[in-house]
Amino acid sequence: MAPTTDATADESSMPGKTVGAAPDALFTLTAELGHAICAGMTGRAGGVSQGPWASLNLGDHVGDDAAAVAANRARLAGALGVRPVYLRQVHGCTVVPIDRHTPDGVPADACWTTDDQVACTVLVADCLPLLFAAPGAASVAAVHAGWRGLAGADGQGILEALVQTWPAVRSAAARRATVVWIGAGIGPRHFEVGPEVRAAFVGAHADDADAFAPSPRDPERWLADLPALARRRLRRLGFEHILGNDGTASWCTASQPSRFFSHRRDAVVFGSSGRMAAVIWRR
């Protein structure tokens, strides 16, 4: 079956019990992952950046004024009460542990921690953020999952690397008890990809074919349902409690310009786009 086609998104609300009005204006989405866990995702409002980065751009690699980015990051840290640790994301499969001594800029696309003084943080503007709370809230993790990292090579991507690297989820029982939240990302109506993207998934798992629909614009291209592909990978790895993004329009970054940054939407017009942060930390 083809992926669900987005309708026009209603930017005034987001669906599901896993999200709600955040207590701080910087957050567009909050994730309910347990009483000892704080987690959520920023939107584009609440910062000081101008132009295509207006206003809460948290990416320091997209051409925005460095002072504005620093001010935005300071606002986020103040809202959290802990330090967000920013990775240098490379669309790869590297997972690193972090603590209060970890500097920003470590090259990786996922991180985990047991330290309650830092927040696992990933930056996104169409790619999916995935936040994980391990059993007992003893450890948390954040993953940046674009199609390259999700697909990986020969079916071994960023989620497989997380399972192999993060001690809290190495056992099947722990994965069954872990809660995962998928944040906002580009929806299936807007994520047009080439045949090589489809092949990267279908070559490893033939049943992923129904997460792709032919593009009505180009017969040689496809519309990919990235949230569905992420959920399938998670279930194959034994994660059962998966909340958040279900691929419907109200979770789509590309269709909600007042709420979210979108690289695909904005870069073709402005030459750049801001970045949002998905964060998770232990109380």
Language-model features: locations:
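Active-site microenvironment for binding and transforming phosphate-containing groups
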Residues: M1-R283
